[in-house]
Amino acid sequence: VLSSADKANIKATWDKIGGHGGEYGAEALERTFLCFPTTKTYFPHFDLSHGSAQVKAHGKKVADALALAAAHLDDLPSALSALSDLHAYKLRVDPVNFKLLSHCLLVTLAAHHPAEFTPAVHSDLDKFLSSVSTVLTSKYR
């Protein structure tokens, strides 16, 4: 459960990300593909090379979904319902991959915003990403 302080940190972080969301999303995806090569199996039709237009486009989709989630912290299930359906019923993404991408996104954010990435912000973002992952995998059951 996200506290009011957690929510404030999450919203403040997403405000700081601003127009860099797509860039950070793509970088997090690249990190995920490099560190956890099995995640590439879900993207056989993508050019997964550094700077690929397809990875950049998907990174923007990831960032946009997280921005939507950050704007609807009090009702993540409704905000992410369509995305949950897509990942559970059509794409059938292994739930562990959400945790791997979340980890790589935290690393990316820490690398770009080291001063703002305090232990409290790290913890709050980790809780947020875990909540998003839980919602995205809720329809697998």
Curated annotation (Swiss-Prot):
Gene3D superfamilies: Globins. Residues 1-141 form the Globin domain. O2 binds at residue 58. The keyword Phosphoprotein applies. Coiled coil: none annotated. Disulfide bonds: none annotated. The modification N6-acetyllysine is found at residue 16. The modification Phosphoserine is found at residues 3, 49, 102, 131, 138. One of its GO terms (cellular component) is hemoglobin complex. The modification Phosphotyrosine is found at residue 24. Red blood cells. GO terms for biological process: hydrogen peroxide catabolic process. The modification Phosphothreonine is found at residues 108, 134, 137. Heme b binds at residue 87. Keywords: Acetylation, Heme, Iron, Metal-binding, Oxygen transport, Phosphoprotein, Transport. GO terms for molecular function: haptoglobin binding; heme binding; iron ion binding; organic acid binding; oxygen binding; oxygen carrier activity; peroxidase activity. The modification N6-succinyllysine is found at residues 7, 11, 16, 40. Belongs to the globin family. Heterotetramer of two alpha chains and two beta chains. Involved in oxygen transport from the lung to the various peripheral tissues. This is Hemoglobin subunit alpha. It comes from Crocuta crocuta. The lineage of its organism: Eukaryota, Metazoa, Chordata, Craniata, Vertebrata. The gene is HBA.
